[in-house]
Each structure stands twice: as structure tokens, then as C-alpha cells.
Amino acid sequence: MDPGQRPNPFGAPGAIPKKPCLSQGSPGTSGSGAPCDEPSRSESPGEGPSGTGGSAAAGDITRQAVVAAITEWSRTRQLRISTGASEGKASIKDWIVCQVNSGKFPGVEWEDEERTRFRIPVTPLADPCFEWRRDGELGVVYIRERGNMPVDASFKGTRGRRRMLAALRRTRGLQEIGKGISQDGHHFLVFRVRKPEEEQCVECGVVAGAVHDFNNMARLLQEGFFSPGQCLPGEIVTPVPSCTTAEGQEAVIDWGRLFIRMYYNGEQVHELLTTSQSGCRISSALRRDPAVHYCAVGSPGQVWLPNVPNLACEIAKRELCDTLDACAKGILLTSSCNGIFCVCYHNGPVHFIGNTVPPDSGPLLLPQGKPTRIFNPNTFLVGLANSPLPAPSHVTCPLVKLWLGKPVAVGKLEPHAPSPRDFAARCSNFSDACVVLEIMPKPLWDAMQ
């Protein structure tokens, strides 16, 4: 064998590898001690471990043990990923809380006295306000203590910070709720520390974090309204002057309320006007103990989807039940005179169409967990002023339409979660959705009466 040539684990080229023995015994032998390529003749077939029945039973036991070991490993791995914990190390949640409490890093600090929200500096490297000790050192500490890789010169930038932020966003015990810029020009992200009760139930985590989502969307509507990152391609952006009179303030309050229609399989089942000014959460009801779960009571501005009506078609009824079960975490909406923002937690595809969608485009797929502006009243009002009788189009329509699809099934041949590209490809047919929502700001609904 050449010095650089590696040995072939399957023997010589062209040789037929021996089948491993599934029964218990020493390597290379059967359960009775005979070689694996020569069946044992000490017992007749079907009698004892070396027989046909014994080998099959031993093989089934071995397969079950392997499947159990793989299942336990997968469960442990998912738990380790969700909590950020590893052997001999604390969880990511406990680690970052310890770093915030230490006060060693400028800008890494608590945002409230209850110590439920903290800031992480994220000033870009090219920004003149970038400071290594504030914006980069914590990322290097993360790599050194938890990254399981050597720290070299490449981590002098923001590479370590990017890895740390990715780990924080994957952690179930933390929730990214916003971002901002301090008075001295430094950028930061805001994370919320979830309560232990929220980590046991995914719906409870969404309900408890709904207030923070509402505040984040309200901030985007007020401050980040003209940010290019919040605008879709081809979207028209026109500012609205602030109102200072009493009538103007009342009108601003009305813009925070929404008129909602709900359709099941093409038939209207419910309509309502929301009462909360901060926002609303549309979800299906869950039968859980209110003393233990937040999700049984709902968030502020809770809107429950109606129960499944009596349908003659069992297939349609089953699809409707699956869609409502997928909407347990729900959809969050916040409205103002600057538009409507939405955060989708629906466990399935949700398509929407409104005047923020380009005129030559069809319904778009809502991203999961990301604030998205789905309606701009300024576009509707400006278009109405320019043309009293505009052509029928979703750009000139005063409402938003949402199609809630059933969960995307993962095939038996692909046990992994679908990639975003595959997910979008499977969700391309929005017409299959059996739950449809029509959402309109209250002032526009009042004007149409």
C-alpha cells in the first residue's frame, strides 16, 4: 500500500463485504460463536438464537435499540439547540444574563428595572460610531467560551457578534422584540427574557410576547415608517401630517381600530370591530387550563376565530379543522394612520394582498415572525384623490385580504423541515386556503357605510 493511500474499509476492490450479524455475540461471530458467513448447525432452524426465528427476534430487538438511541439523541440535540446548553456549560439564556449583570461590556445593559429586557450593541463595522469594546468584544468572548473554535484575527470584526446573535435568536428562552439607536448614535437590539412558563408552551410564548410585538410594530409605524427595509418593491410611500386638534386626535384613535370579516370555505361566518387601540391578535381558541396557560385567556385585543360549523363534506371539515389548529399561535395586527403592520405566527402558509403589493403582482407569502406592512392608507387616499373612479385593483382597494392555509405536510422521504424555498414553492397556490380574512381600518369602513 502506498504511504498516502488510505485502507479500504470494505476490503479489496470487487470483493463482496460480509453482512454484519444482528444477533448478540462477539464481533464476526453469530450468537452461538460461529462465524457470521457460516450459519451455526448446532440448532435447527427456528429453535434458538442461531435459527431463523431467533435471529429475526434478535435483529428486531437490535433495531429497536438503535431506533430508541437515535430518537433519544435527536431529542437531546433539539433540547440543547433550543436552550443553547451543552455538556459542562450553562444555557445561552443564563450565559447572556450573566454577561448583562456583570457590567463588563459597555452598551450591554438592562432596559427596564424588572430586568426582563436587555440591549445588545450592533453598530455596523463601517459606521463611524463603531467601537470595538462596545460592539465587538462580547462576540469574541462568546466564541472563546462557547464557540468551540479558536479565536483568530478574523474575529476582530463582527464575525463573533453575528454568531452570538444567531445563537440568541435560536434560543427558546429569549425573544428579539425590537431595535433602536441611542442618542450617541450606537445601534442596538432589544431581547426579552421569557418566563419559565412560556418555555413550556409555544402558544403561551406568543401570547406573553404580544405586547412587545405591538409596541415594536407601533414604533415602526411611527419612527421607521420611511425605512427602505420596511417597504416592498414598487410600494408608494407618502407621509401623512400629524393631527393636533381634538377631532384629529379622535381620528388618529379610530385608525387604531380595525374592521374584520371572516370567511370559512367562501361563506362569511363573522364580522367585528376591534376595540383595542394597541392592536389585536387573531387566533383559534385552545381548551387549556387558564390557571396554568396564558394562551387560554389570550392577549390584549384578543379576537377568537369561530368554531367549525356543521359541514356535510367530511374532507372540507377536516381541512378547516387542520387550518384552525395551525392558527393556535395566531396573527398579530397593529394599525395607525400610517398603515397596518402584521406579525404572522400561523403554522402554515399565509398569503396577503393589499396596496403595499406591487400592481403587477399577485398575493405574496407573509414571512414568519417578521413585522410586515400590509396596508398603506396614504396610497389609497392619494389614488382616490387623483381619480374619483379608479380602475379595480388591489392597489386602490381599501382593505387587505389574508388567506390562511393548512399546515405544510412533510413527506416520508424527507423527514427534515422544508427549506424556505421549498416552503414557498408548496405554498404557491393560495386558492386552496379555506379561511379568509378581510381587514380594513375603521375610518375607511365608516366612509363606505
Swiss-Prot record:
Molecular function as annotated in GO: DNA-binding transcription factor activity, RNA polymerase II-specific; protein domain specific binding; protein sequestering activity; RNA polymerase II cis-regulatory region sequence-specific DNA binding
Region of interest: Disordered: 1-60
Gene that specifies this protein: vIRF-1
Subcellular location: Host cytoplasm
Name of the molecule in the record: VIRF-1
PANTHER family: INTERFERON REGULATORY FACTOR, IRF TRYPTOPHAN PENTAD REPEAT DOMAIN-CONTAINING PROTEIN
Effect on the protein upon substituting K406R: Strong loss of propionylation
Subunit structure of this chain's protein: Forms homodimers. Interacts with host IRF3, IRF7, and CREBBP. Interacts with host SYNCRIP. Interacts with host USP7. Interacts (via C-terminus) with host HERC5. Interacts with host GABARAPL1. Interacts with host SIRT6.
UniProt DNA-binding residue ranges: 89-195
Organism: Human herpesvirus 8 type P (isolate GK18)
Gene3D superfamilies registered for this protein in UniProt: 2.60.200.10, Winged helix-like DNA-binding domain superfamily/Winged helix DNA-binding domain
GO biological process, one term: immune system process
Keywords, ordered alphabetically: Host cytoplasm, Host-virus interaction, Inhibition of host innate immune response by virus, Inhibition of host IRF3 by virus, Inhibition of host RLR pathway by virus, Ubl conjugation, Viral immunoevasion
Organism lineage string: Viruses, Duplodnaviria, Heunggongvirae, Peploviricota, Herviviricetes
Presence of the UniProt keyword Ubl conjugation in the record: yes
Function (record text): Plays a role in the inhibition of host innate response by repressing the expression of interferon-inducible genes and blocking host IRF1- and IRF3-mediated transcription. Blocks the interaction between host IRF3 and CREBBP. Regulates the host cellular metabolism by increasing glucose uptake, ATP production and lactate secretion through down-regulation of heterogeneous nuclear ribonuclear protein Q1/SYNCRIP. Mechanistically, induces ubiquitination and degradation of SYNCRIP through the ubiquitin-proteasome pathway by recruiting KLHL3/CUL3 ubiquitin ligase complex.
Cross-referenced InterPro entries: Interferon_reg_fact_DNA-bd_dom, Interferon_reg_factor-3, SMAD-like_dom_sf, SMAD_FHA_dom_sf, WH-like_DNA-bd_sf, WH_DNA-bd_sf
Family stated for the protein in its record: Belongs to the IRF family.
